[in-house]
Structure formats: structure tokens, C-alpha cells
């Protein structure tokens, strides 16, 4: 029988640096308003009553996290992350070995809406595999010629989706798929790709396109706009 309305643990891989932000400070520690991007991302998870624990995987040399209020939050656990995202996620999964379902959320994705999170969590009522938040591709997509800045051809956008986070899976299934994929040298770009590698087909749960990941300098102002708009809407 599929699990129904069980408590959920979350893993946030936050050991990366994000060199495309062109800043000495890791992007998850840049501020939007009076909170860091990481705090916005984690608080969005903790705002849902089913999320009882968040494991944050940080770099072993990270001295910034200890200065945040999150460091003393009773629902937060910190573990050492690895060189790659998958290594950090596996470290987080080890810390929640008894959890049945886990969310994995980007440390630099601060604009998660509660209605999107609720719809993603609801799939645990009927799914044995899990799924991800995703946004349908609306722009015309071009594939470039290998090694060149020239168009090779237009890619049919029907059935193309932008993968977002959180991604939500049974803990044991995700652990086993990540472990197998890494052991066999598969290229893992997100958690869903590990399940795909092992022959599973996670669900696509349509989410809002403003659930952006802060990757480049211009993303910071856009994320601030989205967060400010959400705050104003909640107060209205």
C-alpha cells in the first residue's frame, strides 16, 4: 500500500560554491532582505506541517552556516557534504535512515510556493516512485552545434519540462538508485536522473515558473522581486 500523509524529511545540499555568481561568497549565503538565500529556501520547507526535519549538507570547511539562526533550529541537522551534489544528498539520506519519504531541495532556490509544495507532497498518497516539481517549456528551444555557438536545429518543445525542486521520493528507493548510479559511473544531474537511470519514471508535478534557482548575478534581483511580491500577497 502506498504511504499516506506520513511525516517527511528534507535534504538540502548546500556544499557547492556557485562560481557563475562571480562572487567570493557562496551563493546560498548571499542575502535577500534580512535572510540568506539558504534561509529562505529552508524556511519554505519548514513552513509545511508534514516536513518535520531538514538535513543541510555543507562543505566541511564552511564557517558561515554556524553564524545563522538556522544553526540552532531544533528541526535542523547538519552533515558534511561531498564533492558532488549526489554525494551530499547521500550524506543527508544517511542522517534520516528511518524516514520513508524525503524531499531534496536546492539551497539556492528560495522562491518555493506552499501550494506547489503541498501538491508535490500529496503524490505520496498514490505513488511508489515519487516525482518532481517541473515547469513546461514555453520558449522555442534550439540545440547548438557541438563546440560552436551556432544553431544545429530546433528542438520540439512538446513534452519538454524544466526540472525544478523540491524532488520527492521514497528514501530507500532514492538511496539505492543514487548509490547504483554513482557506482556505475552514470551522469547524475538531479535526483530524478538517478531514478531514471534505474528504470523508474517519476511523476511531473507542474510548479510555478517563478520557483527559480539563483545561479547568475541577475537572478538575485529577480528572486528578491518574487519574494517581495509573495510577502505582499500574503499580507493582502
Curated annotation (Swiss-Prot):
<comment type="similarity">
    <text>Belongs to the IspD/TarI cytidylyltransferase family. IspD subfamily.</text>
</comment>
<comment type="pathway">
    <text>Isoprenoid biosynthesis; isopentenyl diphosphate biosynthesis via DXP pathway; isopentenyl diphosphate from 1-deoxy-D-xylulose 5-phosphate: step 2/6.</text>
</comment>
<comment type="subunit">
    <text>Homodimer.</text>
</comment>
<comment type="function">
    <text>Catalyzes the formation of 4-diphosphocytidyl-2-C-methyl-D-erythritol from CTP and 2-C-methyl-D-erythritol 4-phosphate (MEP).</text>
</comment>
<protein>
    <recommendedName>
        <fullName>2-C-methyl-D-erythritol 4-phosphate cytidylyltransferase</fullName>
        <ecNumber>2.7.7.60</ecNumber>
    </recommendedName>
</protein>
<keyword id="KW-0414">Isoprene biosynthesis</keyword>
<feature type="site" description="Positions MEP for the nucleophilic attack">
    <location>
        <position position="213"/>
    </location>
</feature>
<dbReference type="GO" id="GO:0050518">
    <property type="term" value="F:2-C-methyl-D-erythritol 4-phosphate cytidylyltransferase activity"/>
</dbReference>
<dbReference type="InterPro" id="IPR029044">
    <property type="entry name" value="Nucleotide-diphossugar_trans"/>
</dbReference>
<dbReference type="InterPro" id="IPR034683">
    <property type="entry name" value="IspD/TarI"/>
</dbReference>
<feature type="site" description="Positions MEP for the nucleophilic attack">
    <location>
        <position position="157"/>
    </location>
</feature>
<dbReference type="InterPro" id="IPR018294">
    <property type="entry name" value="ISPD_synthase_CS"/>
</dbReference>
<dbReference type="Pfam" id="PF01128">
    <property type="entry name" value="IspD"/>
</dbReference>
<dbReference type="GO" id="GO:0019288">
    <property type="term" value="P:isopentenyl diphosphate biosynthetic process, methylerythritol 4-phosphate pathway"/>
</dbReference>
<dbReference type="InterPro" id="IPR001228">
    <property type="entry name" value="IspD"/>
</dbReference>
<feature type="site" description="Transition state stabilizer">
    <location>
        <position position="20"/>
    </location>
</feature>
<keyword id="KW-0548">Nucleotidyltransferase</keyword>
<keyword id="KW-0808">Transferase</keyword>
<feature type="site" description="Transition state stabilizer">
    <location>
        <position position="27"/>
    </location>
</feature>
<dbReference type="InterPro" id="IPR050088">
    <property type="entry name" value="IspD/TarI_cytidylyltransf_bact"/>
</dbReference>
Amino acid at each position: 500500500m502506498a504511504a499516506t500523509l506520513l511525516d517527511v524529511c528534507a535534504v538540502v545540499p548546500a556544499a557547492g560554491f556557485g562560481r557563475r555568481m562571480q562572487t567570493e561568497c557562496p551563493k546560498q549565503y548571499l542575502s535577500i532582505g534580512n535572510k540568506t538565500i539558504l534561509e529562505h529556501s529552508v524556511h519554505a520547507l519548514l513552513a509545511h506541517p508534514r516536513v518535520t526535519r531538514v538535513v543541510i549538507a555543507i562543505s566541511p570547511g564552511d564557517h558561515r552556516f554556524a553564524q545563522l539562526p538556522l544553526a540552532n533550529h531544533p528541526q535542523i541537522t547538519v552533515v558534511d557534504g561531498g564533492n558532488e551534489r549526489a554525494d551530499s544528498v547521500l550524506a543527508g539520506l544517511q542522517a534520516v535512515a528511518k524516514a520513508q519519504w524525503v524531499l531534496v531541495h536546492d539551497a539556492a532556490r528560495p522562491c518555493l510556493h506552499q501550494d506547489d509544495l503541498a501538491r508535490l507532497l500529496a503524490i505520496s498518497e498514490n505513488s511508489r516512485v515519487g516525482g518532481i516539481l517541473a515547469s513546461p517549456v514555453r520558449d522555442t528551444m534550439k540545440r547548438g552545434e557541438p563546440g560552436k555557438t551556432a544553431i544545429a536545429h530546433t528542438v520540439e518543445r512538446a513534452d519538454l519540462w524544466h526540472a525544478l525542486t523540491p524532488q520527492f521520493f521514497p528514501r530507500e528507493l532514492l538511496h539505492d538508485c543514487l548509490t547504483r548510479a554513482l557506482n556505475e559511473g552514470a551522469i547524475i544531474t538531479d535526483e530524478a536522473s538517478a531514478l531514471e537511470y534505474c528504470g523508474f519514471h517519476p511523476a511531473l508535478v507542474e510548479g510555478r515558473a517563478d520557483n527559480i534557482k539563483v545561479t547568475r548575478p541577475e537572478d538575485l534581483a529577480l528572486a528578491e522581486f518574487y519574494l517581495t511580491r509573495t510577502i505582499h500577497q500574503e499580507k493582502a
